[in-house]
């Protein structure tokens, strides 16, 4: 299992557009074959750094996933939205694997008070 960390540099004046873009992947990414961990918008510190994180079995599975995403209707619409609105200034992907090889588990969070 590998995890893809997408680092975005976004226009800080178009955070709302980035959030719309991020929410649109909630269905498309899993439908096309990756395990979405989440999208993260700036909160404190830099107003321009955002992240997307998902896991997938291998680089070969990643290539097949990208091909499915390219023909997915919602995926195509979301890519077009990003190109039209130009809120992503830069995007880079890094692929990592867990050091011990174990799958990443999401921690249980305490209930809000």
Predicted region positions:
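Short acidic, gly/pro-rich beta-turn/loop elements at beta-sheet edges
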Residues: 16-18, 62-64, 103-105
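Intrinsic disorder/low-complexity detector
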Residues: 1, 72, 84-113
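Short, well-ordered beta-strand segments in beta-rich or mixed alpha/beta enzyme
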Residues: 2-9, 38-70, 93-94, 107-110
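Short, surface-exposed ligand-recognition loops at beta-strand->loop->(often short) alpha-helix junctions
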Residues: 9-20
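Intrinsically disordered, low-complexity segments enriched in polar/charged residues with Gly/Pro
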Residues: 14-15, 40-43, 80
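An amphipathic, aromatic/His-enriched active-site/gating alpha helix that lines ligand/cofactor pockets
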Residues: 20-37, 56-95
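Residues that cap or initiate secondary-structure elements
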Residues: 12-14, 58-60, 99
């Amino acid at each position: 299992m590998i995890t893809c960390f997408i680092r975005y540099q976004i226009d800080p004046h178009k955070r709302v557009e980035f959030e719309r873009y991020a929410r649109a992947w909630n269905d498309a990414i899993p439908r096309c074959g990756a395990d979405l961990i989440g999208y993260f918008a700036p909160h404190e510190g830099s107003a321009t750094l955002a992240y997307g994180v998902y896991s997938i079995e291998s680089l070969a599975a990643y290539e097949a996933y990208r091909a499915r995403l390219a023909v997915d209707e919602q995926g195509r619409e979301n890519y077009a939205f990003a190109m039209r609105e130009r809120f992503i200034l830069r995007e880079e992907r890094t692929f990592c694997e867990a050091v011990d090889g174990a799958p990443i588990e999401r921690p249980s969070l305490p209930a809000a008070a």
